[in-house]
Amino acid sequence: MENTKTNASSSGMSSSSSFSVSYAEEMLLADEVSKINSMSILGPNQLKLCTQLVLSNGAAPVVLSLVSKEKKSILNRMLPKIGQRMYVHHSAIYLLYMPNILKSSSGSITLKLFNEATGELVDVDTDHDATQACIFAGRYPRSILAKDAAKGHDLKLVVHAVASTNANSAVGVLYPIWEDELSRKQILERGADFLKFPIAETEPVRDLLNAGKLTDFVLDRTRLGVGSKNDPSPVLLEPRAKITGKAKTVFIPEGPSVPNTTINGMAPTVRIDAGSPKGLGVPKGFTYESFIKDEILPDH
């Protein structure tokens, strides 16, 4: 069977051109394209990781086309000949979500698949805890026409995030990974829910209290005394949490022996001897000026 197409100009048949397309040749070309996409040299799983999607609190939904640039390039080249007989399959879709907010916060993530050609929606998860890391795994149970995918009417991922944190702050990061395949055969599968695999939080970094690193940190910022030949030996650190008590304040009453004197507009601080017989330990005839002259500036 042959399909004949003729192009004629308005001036007549003199400038016309005709060509024949063999149906068998079309099918042979479609088979070759399908085989190329399933060759072992390309790997059994042609997974694509495009980029990371940062999900912002309350921002507009993020929309990502799940057709790789390689497949779009093939579609644009082959569409005039076999585009009507080719399909795009999404046999594997993985969505890795990593939260950016703490467990003490709250939020939810909505993920959907949208077939722009048909207008249909498939729920991946409509109320995922934004504080929980996980991997979603699934597939789309129908084929996308190659001619629709070439025009941009393909399968799209739609993600929206809402949290109790500041507006437009990063709630989490989503890493979409998928496998798209060109084939001349359609798929007809029973729709199934996406699987969700939670990711547990890890333990704190083991060398957080590494004595050697802390010693190096101190030595970089501390000048050793004169005559020091050896570095201080590291000791085992035992972190302790202790609630400090309320600070005690000693007030010195004004009187004849303690005049209210200031220097340059600021009242100087005096060390009090709490073990003196009078409790305050302020000698008779004490003045701030004499204290500064005798104790703080003895050589002046």
Swiss-Prot record:
Endpoints of the signal sequence: none
InterPro entries linked: Bromo_MP (IPR002538)
Keyword annotations of the record: Host cell junction, Transport, Viral movement protein
Subcellular location(s) per record: Host cell junction, Host plasmodesma
One BP term from GO: transport of virus in host, cell to cell
GO cellular component, as recorded: host cell plasmodesma
Entry superkingdom: Viruses
Main location: host cell
General function of this protein: Transports viral genome to neighboring plant cells directly through plasmosdesmata, without any budding. The movement protein allows efficient cell to cell propagation, by bypassing the host cell wall barrier. Acts by forming a tubular structure at the host plasmodesmata, enlarging it enough to allow free passage of virion capsids.
Family designation: Belongs to the alfamovirus movement protein family.
Protein name as it appears in the record: Movement protein
